[in-house]
Amino acid sequence: MAQTVADVMTRNPATIERGESAAEAARLMARGDMGDVIVLDNGTVSGIVTDRDIAIRLVAEEKDPRTPVAEIVSDAELATATPDMPLDQAIQLMRSRSVRRLPVLQQGRAVGVLSLGDLAMERDQGSALADISAAEGNA
């Protein structure tokens, strides 16, 4: 039987409203030992902010940590998956959109995130990325 996104995704993603600060997004990432937070616009999924976004669009540009996440999140159309999407289809979507993470939505609500780390742990358990992704955080 073909695997689905639900079989591999990280469940219960952290969320933040777009007006909240980048510093709060970073705190959520640190608290949850993760590299992303789903961005909401009045409760509706509107984007995903990553540790890389914070490094490149906030720290490197010497912006204030109180900057709203809306100002650092990518403005590209958000690629998403559903829990029942075949895993191979989600991987193809990630390749075609050049994204490392896909928010997983069910009836418009964020239920997970599919990341390269999740895929590495599932598809190539001996890889360095799988080892790193499976390790406990050192924060």
Please annotate each region the language model reported.
Residues 102, 117, 121-124:
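C-terminal structural segments of small proteins and small subunits
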Residues 128:
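Extracytoplasmic/periplasmic copper-protein system
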Residues 1-28, 34, 39-41, 45-46, ...:
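Bateman/CBS regulatory modules and CBS-like beta-alpha motifs in cytosolic regions of diverse proteins
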